[in-house]
């Protein structure tokens, strides 16, 4: 688990708490969330307000706050949420997707285990699952859930790494030229 001060240092961004937040109320983060519909343990969650062609994650902050989330990565000033989220913490970054990828890259750097990256146009999930079935009896493996192979899915998969793992199997797919380098 990371605390928000550590994450602020990793992302080189300001950590801002609203008027009712204090240092001893900083959440300990074990879950990264990009889809508000997938909230499980609010008190351990850091929500990344991604801005995509399909929508703006910032609009879900008040709802997530009401459901118990207190830690957010935003690309807009947190001032607009001051009244609706009085006990929230905000990490303000230029680009929330880049911040997600940067945090996952830092987390990966803490582990010295083999990582198998499975790429290609077709068959990534089948190959990953086949390798998992083949090696699972002799290794403690972390793997991408389902088809988490996108610019968002890969960092969420990498975040699952724990000291007990001795092998990682991650899918990586791209939609645009240049995306593989970011993964």
Residue ranges and their predicted role:
Residues 1-102:
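N-terminal leader/targeting and accessory segments in enzymes
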Residues 99-183:
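Phosphate-binding loop of NTP-binding sites
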